[in-house]
Amino acid sequence: VHDDSLWNKPSVRQALGEALAFLTGDRWALSFVRRQHDVVEVGPRKLDLSIPDKIIMPYSDGLDSRAVAALVAAKENGGLVRVRLGTKGADTKGTPRKQRRFTAVPFDVKLGKRQRVESSARSRGFKFAMITGIAAQLAKVDRIVVTESGQGALGPIIASSGQIYPDYRVHPAFTQRIEKLFAAMGKSVPTYEYPRIWYTKGETLAAAHALEAAPTWHDTRSCWQDSRRVSFGGRRRQCGICAACMLRRMSMHTAGIVEASDEYIWENLGARDIHGGTVKG
């Protein structure tokens, strides 16, 4: 790290350890060493924005992200900065490039030959929380909006699977610990807001769909299956029957949004058998 004295402060290590332990259920022993070489600094660049930044939002381009981004942008009348881990995606195409409040954060971790990719997906929640917190520091913004509805934020701990440790990735109790970490580091403390936590996914989609400038939905993905399992006719579909697809379809139905049946491999949920439900061919 650049500032090993900061990261090795007992208060910082304790706050970081508590956040990680709460997220993963593991015990953490943390140590930090100073970098041997400084990172080349990039000069600051100014964005041509008429409205100052107000809110940071972690963005995945899924249903929740699109819906909540549209709702927040409409309510706040601008100033929303969407932050994505990775380089895929862009902001609204109709907006001039210099005015797009969309920041992609390249994130790459190289593993040794004997190391395995973390499989619980919980590191993703930590990365999103930290990157958006850092973005808030850089933009001098103290509000971070979390896009999850009640199912996403509270559901995983209410209905945990088997004997696994509860999933707190987007739970307010976890983001409160991230706030304490920034406070221990002596930084300005962002507040993580949950504007849709007391709504269902379907209610959130319905509210966004009712906006004058409603988002598009057909080009979002919810399915857990990869292209090898759900491709047909040279196009990648969604399976239609995994847990993520079922929540998507129920939420779309609740919101009154009609999807084309050919978005899914299992086109007809009302069919009696697999032959009547899946795409022909």
Segments (PLM) and residue ranges:
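Nucleotide-activated chemistry modules centered on ATP-dependent adenylation/adenylyltransferase
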Residues: A19, L23-I56, L63-G281
